[in-house]
Amino acid sequence: MQGFVEDFLKPRLVDIQQISATHAKITLEPLERGFGHTLGNALRRILLSSISGCAVTEVEIDGILHEYMHKEGVKEDILDILLNLKGLSIKLFGKDEVTLYLKKSGIGPVLAKDINHDNSTEIINNKHIICNLTCSDASIDIRMKVTRGRGYITAKSRKENYDNEHIIGKLFLDVTYSPIERIMYTVESARVEQRTDLDKLIIEMETNGTIDPEDAIRKAATILAQQLEAFVDLRGVREPEIKEEKPEFEPVLLRPVDDLELTVRSANCLKAESIHYIGDLVQKTEVELLKTPNLGKKSLTEIKDVLASRGLSLGMKLDNWPPKSLLED
């Protein structure tokens, strides 16, 4: 029995089929028999319940006191407008909560691109229809709160945070934060040399555009691995006390640039310049970054704002960078 665990086959990522920017099919093999369903179901549940995202949670519409009223000059009922607001795909950079405003008048559709926002917010589906105005003197004025979270939160639980006096005119939404819109997995037979009783795991998923499917599966796998760490040593052996040493660098500098949740364009530009860690990024100056192909002033402003929200800035000097721990990785 000794070495039995080491005898297990280790799967490898054999194919990533990028069907579209939001739709991908990922294949892993070979897996020991039965492990296809074991891992596939676990990853599926984590992807649906534990990947964080952003959503509209509270809405105020001028002249509307509750969701069963009707807005003059607007084709949709208030309930339909709320459902359409739930369909917005939103990313927040450096913030966990923002308030967005939408004002529109005149005949025609009211689209997601009509929402006013700053660089801390990106709306992916700009052509998403929120409602339709039916006459020239029709108008709509919406105030919406967007928050970051994970899982499912009911409107009732949000109402409990307000007293009756401050709840009038606020419309609360049931929220599913997960950016995963569809996830399914299949298990097929795989073969390694003479063994034909192995599994191939195929995961197919679609996101709302706020996260890359490959990044989503990586985050889900990381969450699963972290939750299982406690079972690695069931004896619960007490680790020897180690004197705390002041770290050479702030922990935030050792984190990957992906943790900044930059737009895809900005992130790709940094990766092309081999800027993988936040410590790499903060040592760059504005002039150096502007020399990066395809990285313009808008991306530079985004990077500066995200760093500032973490108490960092460009042009920092870090002695003895990179640390040995990163070089060993």
Curated annotation (Swiss-Prot):
Disulfide bonds: none annotated. It is an enzyme of class 2 (transferase). Signal peptide: none annotated. Residues 249-329 are annotated as: Alpha C-terminal domain (alpha-CTD). GO terms for molecular function: DNA binding; DNA-directed RNA polymerase activity; protein dimerization activity. Gene3D superfamilies: 5' to 3' exonuclease, C-terminal subdomain, DNA-directed RNA polymerase, insert domain, RNA polymerase, RBP11-like subunit. One of its GO terms (biological process) is DNA-templated transcription. Keywords: DNA-directed RNA polymerase, Nucleotidyltransferase, Transcription, Transferase. It catalyses: RNA(n) + a ribonucleoside 5'-triphosphate = RNA(n+1) + diphosphate. Residues 1-235 are annotated as: Alpha N-terminal domain (alpha-NTD). InterPro entries: DNA-dir_RNA_pol_insert, DNA-dir_RNA_pol_RpoA/D/Rpb3, DNA-dir_RpoA, RBP11-like, RNAP_asu_C, RNApol_insert_sf. GO terms for cellular component: cytoplasm; DNA-directed RNA polymerase complex. Its EC number is 2.7.7.6. It holds the Pfam family RNA_pol_L. DNA-dependent RNA polymerase catalyzes the transcription of DNA into RNA using the four ribonucleoside triphosphates as substrates. Homodimer. The RNAP catalytic core consists of 2 alpha, 1 beta, 1 beta' and 1 omega subunit. When a sigma factor is associated with the core the holoenzyme is formed, which can initiate transcription. Belongs to the RNA polymerase alpha chain family. The N-terminal domain is essential for RNAP assembly and basal transcription, whereas the C-terminal domain is involved in interaction with transcriptional regulators and with upstream promoter elements. This is DNA-directed RNA polymerase subunit alpha.
